[in-house]
């Protein structure tokens, strides 16, 4: 069980950050966001390799010390997240790196090892796989095209999907490929299974496993990382 592979799709542009480079290459404390994310995955005792999918013309990755790490593998990503994940899966399956993969957002540097371990334990015992998720706590409203409230949505069964998301590499590869062939919109790995009527497990994860999408998220991620370092 100690040879899991993590996949990090990192070919996105992240235009909402309004920065001069993709958000995964913005500086967070003393490193890039991507370095924090990948190094954190590598430090988990059950993860052997991390496959990073970046744009073919990415000018940043090769300049990171991370690019030369013996357990980090670079592959070309695609236009959409699903394309990048599929490219990484092709490598994992071709080289038989591991039976299972954990797909994790490049812009989520704050995931805890405890959450990763709980995800792995749950996924291995489930027939399909599992994802980290956080129960919705806020009151949810459905709006119309004028941004007016239509009604309040029952939040009882609603979850925020987080990452990592863990599935068997071959199963995820087959489902992603089939969905893309049918032009099905795939927003995360679990949705490739949902499309087939399959139900991955939900693993309650920490809400501080935030995804950096807005400029203010950098400051919050810095706080979480600094706090976690003090605790360790």
From Swiss-Prot:
| Xref: InterPro entries | IspD, IspD/TarI, IspD/TarI_cytidylyltransf_bact, ISPD_synthase_CS, Nucleotide-diphossugar_trans
Q: Which domain of life is it from?
A: Bacteria
CDD domains in the record, alphabetically?
A: CDP-ME_synthetase
Biological-process GO terms, alphabetical: isopentenyl diphosphate biosynthetic process, methylerythritol 4-phosphate pathway
Catalyses which reaction? 2-C-methyl-D-erythritol 4-phosphate + CTP + H(+) = 4-CDP-2-C-methyl-D-erythritol + diphosphate
A single Gene Ontology MF term assigned here is: 2-C-methyl-D-erythritol 4-phosphate cytidylyltransferase activity
Q: Does the keyword Thylakoid apply?
A: no
Per the record's keyword annotation, is Transferase included, yes or no? yes
Which keywords does this chain's UniProt record carry?
Isoprene biosynthesis, Nucleotidyltransferase, Transferase
Site keyed Positions MEP for the nucleophilic attack: positions: 155, 211
Q: What's one Pfam family here?
A: IspD
What is this enzyme's EC? Answer: 2.7.7.60
Protein's pathway? Isoprenoid biosynthesis; isopentenyl diphosphate biosynthesis via DXP pathway; isopentenyl diphosphate from 1-deoxy-D-xylulose 5-phosphate: step 2/6
Which residues does the UniProt site feature Transition state stabilizer point to? Answer: 16, 23
**PROSITE patterns (alphabetical):** ISPD
Classification via NCBIfam families: ispD (TIGR00453)
**Family, per the entry?**
Belongs to the IspD/TarI cytidylyltransferase family. IspD subfamily.
Its biological purpose: Catalyzes the formation of 4-diphosphocytidyl-2-C-methyl-D-erythritol from CTP and 2-C-methyl-D-erythritol 4-phosphate (MEP).
Protein name, UniProt field: 2-C-methyl-D-erythritol 4-phosphate cytidylyltransferase
List the lineage, top down: Bacteria, Pseudomonadati, Pseudomonadota, Gammaproteobacteria, Vibrionales
The gene is ispD
